[in-house]
């Protein structure tokens, strides 16, 4: 590896690397957000109680079957294959010329949605059943219970998994180069094809990928800590209040 070549590649092709990194982040952010929304909707639908008989039971069974097929298909096939099928398949079957970036957003979104659906469903199931029973006792239906009681807890609980999906998407967008999306990997291939210094070019790409994933991971951990709040609490006057240092010391002395 030549350090001089790395410096030269960065100086001559810096804008291409930055443009590719921006497209990677753009697709990852939008794809993760849309995928999370898809996952929330599917998670809520799949946890609707199925009655023992009636038309509602038949409808829910059909809908759950379709959603399960969607989840299994996109979780069970590689994203690179999905990209080829959706982009080239839509053009061949329906004569639709999809914009490459839009196709990338669509692929990442529906792929993430399949994974997030199971994460959300698991988060909903993990909520204490007593909360569902209490909501039902005061006359709430399933969607009111989800909106007012369950989902606020679920969103907090699935935040780490959502962050992991975001980091995975940053790396997995590299497969979109097969449909010529100008993300970081695609731009790096172009740079390496021009100077024939593949190792040095992709070393620069590695550094950029690491900077993005490392930074995003630290930001997400900071957000999680902020949401968790302080570690020490005391109960006073039926109110949950943050304990001050002197309060903790005083209580320790009393004990």
Task: Place the predicted regions along the sequence by residue.
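Transmembrane alpha-helices and adjacent helix-loop boundaries
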Residues: 1-255
